[in-house]
Design a protein with these regions (language model features):
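Core subunits and conserved enzymes of cellular information-processing
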Residues: 1-132
Length: 132
């Protein structure tokens, strides 16, 4: 169990780092990160806080649909949101930061290998697909 939790922690940390890299590359963002940036600008809060708020809404929808909630989703929602803000402030703004695209696949692979469930976004997509 300790190994699985370590994989989840490392995957979440690396995923947060990769998201911060992509944001600081100024070349674009992942779709959900782009939404978090837009909501953060609209509310006047950081990307991490807006990401947390979006995850809370997704969690509410999942609970309303009587879908399961995973440890991975909860860790991403809390720790991931904090780490994104930390890494965005620590990393330089540079086009070379697009390296985050390569790191993201490895990060989410680590989270998946931990076997502690899917992220909230994946759970929501699965719930929608089951109902269509």
């Amino acid at each position: 169990m300790l190994k699985r939790l370590f994989q989840l922690f490392m995957g979440t940390t690396l995923a947060s780092f990769s998201i911060a890299c992509v944001v600081n590359s100024t070349l674009g963002a992942f779709p959900t990160t782009g939404a978090n940036i837009a909501i953060g600008n609209w509310l006047g809060v950081s990307i991490g806080i807006s990401g947390f708020l979006v995850e809370v809404v997704i969690l509410g929808i999942l609970l309303y649909l009587k879908e399961g909630v995973s440890v991975t989703g909860l860790v991403n929602m809390t720790l991931g949101s904090v780490l994104i803000d930390v890494f965005i402030t620590l990393l330089p703004v540079n086009k070379l930061m697009v390296i985050g695209l390569l790191l993201s696949g490895f990060a989410w692979g680590l989270q998946g290998m931990a076997g502690l469930g899917e992220t909230n976004n994946n759970l929501l997509m699965t719930a929608i697909l089951k109902r269509t």
